[in-house]
Amino acid sequence: MNNQPSFRARVQKFGSFLSGMIMPNIGAFIAWGLITALFIPTGWWPNEQLAELVGPMITYLLPLLIGYTGGKMIYDVRGGVVGAAATMGVVVGADIPMFIGAMIMGPLGGFLIKKVDQVLQPKVRSGFEMLVNNFSAGILAAILAIVAFLGIGPVVVSFSNVLASGVEVIIGAGLLPLASIFIEPAKVLFLNNAINHGILSPIGIDQAASAGKSILFLLETNPGPGLGVLLAFMVFGKGMAKQSAPGAAVIHFAGGIHEIYFPYILMKPTLILAVIAGGMSGVFTFVLFNAGLVAVPSPGSIFALLAMTPRGEYAGVLAGVIIATVVSFVIASIILKTSKATAEDLTEATSKMEGLKGKESSVKEALITDDEQPQATEVNKIIFACDAGMGSSAMGASILRDKVKKAGLSIEVANTSINQLPDDVDIIITHKDLTDRAKAKNPHAEHISVENFLSSPKYDELVNRLKS
């Protein structure tokens, strides 16, 4: 049992690393998706000349961006350059979009050039640094590109074909709705970005390149299950949960920040049944309508889903979202109405969260003894950190930034991903399930755990403390 918290943290870290290669490049993916939806022969405005952008973007641009980002995550720009060059080997050596290959070669290139520098730099004489740095990177990049072209590329192609065939078998057997049994609980455990951008998106993009769309883009991004739970809290919830549910529903459905409904599930874990049932019914509807998207919608907003929907196929996408919402709402309403408890404090919710995760909560002690944690004496920078650094943390930072401004304090409030936490931050605010990872990344800062980024009493407590 003692090893499980570290194992969960490792899974989250690995998933965050995979999604970290995709998330910074989402704008490029959306650009490709829009060009595809607009200008291919079945698009809104078919244009043979502009449609020529589709192939090169998915074959070269997107994999190279992933490879560069993966290398940069390991060893800054130098790692990114070698990672991109290494990625070119798998791109040219394959006849399918090489996203999985890019996610391998990019970090590998960054890791190897980092090790090469560690060996060579202490031995380089003064005046030869630029020569050695440039040629060591160039030689290694050339070797990796050749190895990727001849060896790694064919292996990744075979692996991708096996994955694609497996997905086709699952879809053909009508088993795809069962994926929600795994996806929905994993989302609540903050693996949503890892699932969507690390697993489903690479396979889905391969499908979209050949078939023009992929249903895999809809599995994790469907806002229906979470919306149903939030609507149930709006009608049958109690206390703070009911008061905050309307705002959370708007942010979730329109803004696409799915993390906003996770605390509601963690407060009453039996609601996981509602989102699983909603997810399964939504996927079943997508299968019935043969629905799919041309590219990954990010964030998972209803507007992003509609923007990535092929022309003439809105009915299937909307039907899947609506049915998922209704099913999730009905089941969540039954659970809330039949629940004896009227409210839960944070300690009780944490204990129930242990049952949902099947392990002792690694943050329970931190939650109970939060007041005993060392506090920063001089505060100049406060960082909100989440898994991707773009969704829930941005929302929390905006709320606290407004409070700090109204209090007349000259303190920087920003947001980032846990993997990108700077060293000069004074206070780090994270969701309680991610605090351990943040402490491991930056153990010297003051860490504050919150249960809900949208509404936490700790914001006012912190502002009052900083004013005094």
Swiss-Prot record:
Domain notes: The EIIC type-2 domain forms the PTS system translocation channel and contains the specific substrate-binding site. The PTS EIIB type-2 domain is phosphorylated by phospho-EIIA on a cysteinyl residue. Then, it transfers the phosphoryl group to the sugar substrate concomitantly with the sugar uptake processed by the PTS EIIC type-2 domain.
NCBIfam families: mtlA (TIGR00851), PRK15083.1 (NF011663)
EC number in record: 2.7.1.197
Free-text function comment from the UniProt entry: The phosphoenolpyruvate-dependent sugar phosphotransferase system (sugar PTS), a major carbohydrate active transport system, catalyzes the phosphorylation of incoming sugar substrates concomitantly with their translocation across the cell membrane. The enzyme II CmtAB PTS system is involved in D-mannitol transport.
Record keywords: Cell membrane, Kinase, Membrane, Phosphoprotein, Phosphotransferase system, Sugar transport, Transferase, Transmembrane, Transmembrane helix, Transport
Cytoplasmic side: 1-25, 73-135, 188-274, 337-468
Record's catalysed reaction(s): D-mannitol(out) + N(pros)-phospho-L-histidyl-[protein] = D-mannitol 1-phosphate(in) + L-histidyl-[protein]
Top-rank taxon, per record: Bacteria
Residues bearing the modification Phosphocysteine: C386
Protein name as annotated: PTS system mannitol-specific EIICB component
Domain PTS EIIC type-2: 14-344
Segments on the Extracellular face: 48-51, 158-166, 295-314
One GO-annotated biological process of the protein: phosphoenolpyruvate-dependent sugar phosphotransferase system
Assembly mode: Homodimer.
UniProt GO MF annotations: kinase activity; protein-N(PI)-phosphohistidine-mannitol phosphotransferase system transmembrane transporter activity; protein-phosphocysteine-sugar phosphotransferase activity
Principal localisation: membrane
Native source organism of the sequence: Halalkalibacterium halodurans (strain ATCC BAA-125 / DSM 18197 / FERM 7344 / JCM 9153 / C-125)
Residues annotated as transmembrane: 26-47, 52-72, 136-157, 167-187, 275-294, 315-336
